[in-house]
């Protein structure tokens, strides 16, 4: 058994080998490997399946009580400075290994069909394998230095995959935006790592927390400096997990292929930030101010993402802001000390969001032949509608993911989100109020997406007035039905259900979306009063107060407010965007007749639409204040450098040149001239002395 645990590094090694093999093939045998393009996906999927099976084995060993395993290779670089490379296998690691590998396998199977006709098919699988290997290496890392190495690899792979279609200007700009934004966070992360090494003398996670606690107990730590280091370190997860104010890269990342959007938003890049905060949780707990910053950052991010998602027209960007909001929930949970709830929501959200993104990919794939291949058309929900009758399996799986994300029992996210809502309310009512309000907004915008995409009539052939169509407001049919459009009967193209290869991952991901939440159900046995997930995670950190665990019926009773507000959001979405039943039409006509109400609704809807369209004006503020401000500052610096600094230097040179040119005529080689000049100067000197 010990020999098996010593080979945990095989888990990231297999996808890394797949990436290396495909990369070598593309570099040395580009023409030959393109003839066997299907073989490249088979290699990637097969190697990742091996890694997934190993991950399940290690996960099973951990939940059955096996001890935590650490294995390190050490190098003494300079005197007492030792660099250790290895792995750490504990319950948190084992859960993340299973999460990353299972989602990545489903994404790769899906990509085999989705990307089959793309010229970069093999390159895509090469990048995808490297991306997965980087994330697996990150979760296995036992220290901050190794985390930072794989952290940068994850960032590099995201840059390559977001800009995969780099010939499209929007994709090229999006990958640069993601890269630059994450550089800000990575710089802070590096400062935090170096700062904590200065304090504790260690990069190792276990030693770091232990030494920090000892120094804190003996009052040998400057708390201001330690807090500053923790905030710098937290800046890395803020950027990587798209937290306010470094969230601006996430919606632009939708320019990449849809399968990579699913992987980024479910189990890799954005999960890396949450994972690092969870790994550093024992240390952050000793700094209350930092925990407060984490919780408020999460709450603001959750609310901001939900409000921006309210009126998005782009299907993928709506889901992207949903991811931002749910990541805010996770960060909020970790900030209030609810370690288990935050990680539980990371797990449940990953499967639900992977299902939603892959479902959106199937929708986009079927819409492209009808409306065009540009994202402004194929991803625009205004051109969708009524897809349930053409894509029933995709619609059902998408509905399951939507119900889960809304927090409707018994779907997965209900159990994790409700625990976050209750714990945040008990911790601080204002945070709880923000969390509950955001839950209602989540239900509204998710069902808005579902209704606009799958319900009603198909709008893909309404091309008479594209501009008016694209300006659909938050109030849906209240204003949308005022416009009359004619069907282009010449067109015979209609959406089609995705093929079996693309449907298989959707059906498989539906299983954890429905059932994985049950691992967090609280139950009351004679020998245990905790849930399964808490029991597993307790092996690595005892951060959950079991005395506050509720019985199952009490838990369901406390869930009534969250479920009620979710249903309220769904009802509003149904009223505004749902199928137009006869009684709803009458109510909407009555509402439109009341001019005062109509004016209020229009003004409010315009505000929400502009808030969503301009992304809460944050991108515009960054563009005006930072980009334009920096360019203006550069112009000033350039002017000073060119005309003042260079002017002084060049002026001295010019003055010396002309001075030399003038004085050279004085020197003529005649002694009488020199004598006359000396006498004349002496005369002037004596005359000046006499006058003075």
From Swiss-Prot:
Chief location: plastid
Keyword Chloroplast recorded: yes
Pfam family, one: Proton_antipo_N
Organism domain of life: Eukaryota
Stored InterPro entries: NADH_UbQ_OxRdtase_chlpt_su5_C, NADHpl_OxRdtase_5_subgr, ND/Mrp_TM, NU5C-like, Proton_antipo_N
Family: Belongs to the complex I subunit 5 family.
PANTHER family for the chain: NADH-UBIQUINONE OXIDOREDUCTASE CHAIN 5
Protein name per the record: NAD(P)H-quinone oxidoreductase subunit 5, chloroplastic
Organism: Marchantia polymorpha
């Amino acid at each position: 058994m010990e020999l098996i645990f010593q080979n945990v590094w095989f888990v990231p090694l297999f996808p890394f080998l797949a990436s290396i093999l495909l990369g070598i093939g593309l570099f040395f045998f580009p023409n030959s490997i393109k003839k066997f393009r299907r073989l490249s996906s088979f290699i990637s999927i097969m190697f990742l399946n091996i890694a997934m099976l190993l991950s399940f084995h290690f996960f099973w060993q951990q939940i059955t009580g096996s001890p935590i395993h650490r294995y390190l290779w050490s190098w003494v670089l300079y005197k007492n400075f030792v660099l250790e490379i290895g792995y750490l296998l504990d319950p948190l690691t084992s859960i993340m290994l299973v999460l990353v590998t299972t989602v990545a396998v489903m994404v790769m199977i899906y990509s085999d069909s989705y990307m089959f006709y793309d010229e970069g098919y093999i390159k895509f699988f090469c990048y995808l394998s490297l991306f997965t290997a980087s994330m697996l290496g990150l979760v296995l890392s036992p220290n901050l230095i190794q985390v930072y190495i794989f952290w940068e690899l994850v960032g590099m792979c995201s840059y390559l995959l977001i800009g995969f279609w780099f010939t499209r200007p929007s994709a090229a700009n999006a990958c640069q935006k993601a890269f630059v934004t994450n550089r800000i966070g990575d710089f802070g992360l590096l400062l935090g790592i170096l700062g904590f090494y200065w304090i504790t003398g260690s990069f190792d996670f276990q030693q770091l927390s232990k030494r920090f606690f000892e120094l804190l107990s003996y009052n040998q730590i400057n708390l201001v400096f330690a807090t500053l280091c923790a905030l710098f370190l937290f800046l890395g997860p803020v950027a990587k997990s798209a937290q306010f104010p470094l969230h601006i890269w996430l919606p632009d990342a939708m320019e990449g292929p849809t399968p990579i959007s699913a992987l980024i938003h479910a189990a890799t890049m954005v999960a890396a930030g949450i994972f690092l905060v969870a790994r550093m949780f024992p240390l952050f707990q000793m700094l209350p101010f930092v925990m407060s910053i984490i919780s408020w950052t999460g709450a603001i991010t959750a609310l901001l993402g939900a409000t921006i998602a309210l009126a998005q027209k782009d299907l993928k960007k709506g889901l992207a802001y949903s991811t931002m909001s749910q990541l805010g929930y996770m960060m909020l949970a970790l900030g209030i000390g609810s370690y288990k709830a935050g990680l539980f929501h990371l797990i449940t959200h990953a499967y639900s969001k992977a299902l939603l993104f892959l479902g959106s990919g199937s929708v986009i794939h079927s819409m492209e032949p009808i409306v065009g291949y540009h994202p402004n058309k194929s991803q625009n929900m205004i051109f969708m509608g009524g897809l349930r009758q053409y894509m029933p399996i995709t619609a059902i799986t998408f509905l399951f993911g939507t119900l889960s994300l809304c927090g409707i029992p018994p779907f997965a996210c209900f159990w994790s989100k409700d625990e976050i809502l209750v714990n945040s309310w008990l911790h601080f009512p204002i945070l709880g109020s923000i969390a509950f309000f955001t839950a209602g907004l989540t239900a509204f915008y998710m069902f808005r997406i579902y209704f606009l995409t799958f319900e009603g009539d198909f709008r893909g052939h309404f091309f008479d007035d594209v501009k008016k169509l694209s300006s659909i407001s938050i109030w849906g049919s209240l204003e949308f039905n005022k416009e009359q459009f004619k069907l282009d009967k010449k067109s015979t193209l209609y959406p089609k259900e995705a093929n079996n290869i693309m449907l298989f991952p959707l059906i498989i991901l539906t299983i954890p979306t429905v059932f994985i939440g049950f691992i967090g159900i609280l139950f009351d046995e004679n020998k245990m009063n905790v849930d399964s997930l808490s029991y597993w995670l307790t092996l690595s950190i005892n951060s959950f107060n079991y005395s506050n665990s509720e019985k199952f019926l009490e838990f369901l009773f406390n869930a009534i407010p969250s479920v009620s507000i979710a249903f309220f959001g769904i009802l509003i979405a149904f009223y505004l965007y749902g199928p137009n039943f006869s009684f709803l039409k009458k109510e909407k006509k009555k509402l439109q007749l009341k001019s005062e109400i109509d004016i209020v609704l229009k003004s409010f809807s315009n505000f929400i639409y502009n808030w969503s369209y301009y992304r809460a004006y944050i991108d515009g503020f960054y563009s005006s204040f930072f980009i334009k401000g920096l360019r203006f500052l550069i112009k000033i610096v350039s002017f000073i450098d060119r005309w003042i600094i260079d002017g002084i230097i060049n002026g001295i040179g010019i003055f010396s040149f002309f001075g030399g040119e003038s004085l050279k005529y004085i020197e003529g080689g005649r002694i009488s001239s020199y004598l006359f000049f000396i006498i004349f100067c002496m005369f002037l000197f004596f005359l000046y002395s006499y006058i003075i």
